[in-house]
């Protein structure tokens, strides 16, 4: 998949689920299931409920995403 195909959108973490999955409410009020990107997992960046995050979505599946950045 080319990097140009992703949709980036901001959201808020609602709930932490097992296996580093999270429920995230996007700015457009949709709730999706997300996992942490590999670089964030490698650097032990912790995600807690209430955190503002940047999420990447693919055009193929708009109900699953990848958390790529946690805002401070």
Curated annotation (Swiss-Prot):
PROSITE patterns: S1_IF1_TYPE
Listed GO CC annotations: cytosol
All residue ranges annotated as the S1-like domain in the record: 1-72
Superkingdom of origin organism: Bacteria
Keyword check for Cytoplasm: yes
GO molecular function: ribosome binding; rRNA binding; translation initiation factor activity
Family recorded in the similarity comment: Belongs to the IF-1 family.
Protein name (database record): Translation initiation factor IF-1
Originating species: Campylobacter jejuni subsp. jejuni serotype O:2 (strain ATCC 700819 / NCTC 11168)
Gene name tied to this protein: infA
């Amino acid at each position: 998949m080319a990097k140009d195909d992703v949709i980036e959108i901001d959201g808020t973490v609602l709930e932490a689920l097992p296996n580093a999955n999270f429920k995230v409410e996007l700015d457009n009020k949709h709730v999706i299931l997300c996992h942490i990107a590999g670089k964030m997992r490698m650097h032990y960046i912790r995600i807690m409920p209430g955190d503002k995050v940047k999420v990447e979505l693919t055009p193929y599946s708009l109900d699953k995403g990848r958390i790529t950045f946690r805002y401070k």
